[in-house]
Swiss-Prot record:
One GO CC term, this protein: nucleoplasm
Molecular function GO labels: cadmium ion binding; DNA binding; zinc ion binding
Alphabetical list of InterPro entries matching this protein: PRM2 (IPR000492)
Biased composition (Basic and acidic residues): 8-17, 39-48
Role noted for this protein: Protamines substitute for histones in the chromatin of sperm during the haploid phase of spermatogenesis. They compact sperm DNA into a highly condensed, stable and inactive complex.
Protein name: Protamine-2
Pfam family, one: Protamine_P2
Gene transcribed to yield this protein: PRM2
Domain of life of the source: Eukaryota
Similarity comment: family membership: Belongs to the protamine P2 family.
Protein keywords: Chromosome, Developmental protein, Differentiation, DNA condensation, DNA-binding, Nucleosome core, Nucleus, Phosphoprotein, Spermatogenesis
Post-translational modification remark: Proteolytic processing into mature chains is required for histone eviction during spermatogenesis. Transition proteins (TNP1 and TNP2) are required for processing.
Length: 102
């Protein structure tokens, strides 16, 4: 999961104002029914809000690349032929790879 930046006070006040307008349209089904005091509203938004955290969908290639870096050193990298890449055929790249760690 990726955490977003902390919102500024102006963004929070605008969001609270928008929630109040939305709550008036629905009636009293907002924060009063849940029994939240104004001090606990911010904590509730942090823990139950969906705006702070976003699920990051990892592709299989990205996961493989991340875990390969953890377990293998750059010297033991496995060589593969250009025919192995069947999805993206961009031609053979014979450029020598250099180690990025050093």
């Amino acid at each position: 999961m990726v955490r977003y930046r902390v919102r500024s006070l102006s963004e929070r006040s605008h969001e609270v104002y928008r929630q109040q307008l939305h709550g008036q349209e629905q009636g009293h089904h907002g924060q009063e029914e849940q029994g939240l005091s104004p001090e606990h509203v911010e904590v509730y938004e942090r823990t139950h809000g969906q705006s702070h955290y976003r699920r990051r969908h990892c592709s299989r290639r990205r996961l493989h690349r991340i875990h390969r870096r953890q377990h293998r050193s750059c010297r033991r990298r496995k060589r593969r032929s250009c025919r192995h890449r069947r999805r993206h055929r961009r031609g053979c790249r014979t450029r020598k790879r250099t180690c990025r760690r050093h």
